[in-house]
Amino acid sequence: MRIKFISFILIFFTIFAFAKEQNLDDFEQEYQNYQVNDPFSGYNKAMTSFNVALYDYGLRPVLKGYNAITPEFIRLGARNFFDNLLAPLRFVGNVLQFKFEEAGEEFKRFAANTIMGFGGLMDVASKMGLKKHPADLGTVLAHWGVGSGFHIVLPILGPSNLRDTLTLPATWYTSFTAYIDPTWASIAISAYGFGNELSFRLDEIDEIYHNTPNLYPFLRDAYEQRRNELSK
């Protein structure tokens, strides 16, 4: 269960962070010929439909209510806090790819936000011009030549591939929340962090899920292309 929640966070952060930076029409035009190893496309399409329904009838209504009763400054503080917890993973990922400049900037971000940002509640690093450099164990393996394997859509967790799925257990143990006892508290904290981040992206997700022709190929190619870009 622990692994599922942290992987849920990482996978969806990857997809929605990329989608936020891209115009949907531009993406479709640029990556329409992108090739993905997808031998289980029938299953993947069905699981994508399941995940969309789960979002529409489960996550979205709950998060709409959460947004209505929770002040934005609280949500933003929580967002910054959980993002700061991922900084050590980004630091390690960049070091293992020999991206020392990026790793150094991640270290500075973590130090600035932890010390001057009240434990990460405030993102002072961005105001100082320090940028994030996404990296994780999956991008490390990709950087050193490990292929992605076949594409797979996981129940609830969403798009992934064989390589990234196999890194999820190790990824979990690089997270501070992995060492919180009891286990239910660790799961609850991770789930809240994911849900809070998602609460900022409901309009974007609605746009992608309900206004994108050929949704499954779009999500599949977005995920695989973004992962490849991060490994360079």
Identify the residue ranges that each predicted region occupies.
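Bacterial N-terminal signal peptides that target proteins for export
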Residues: 1-6
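Surface-exposed interaction patches
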Residues: 120-127, 140, 145-231
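Short low-complexity stretches enriched in small and charged residues
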Residues: 41, 109-111, 174-176
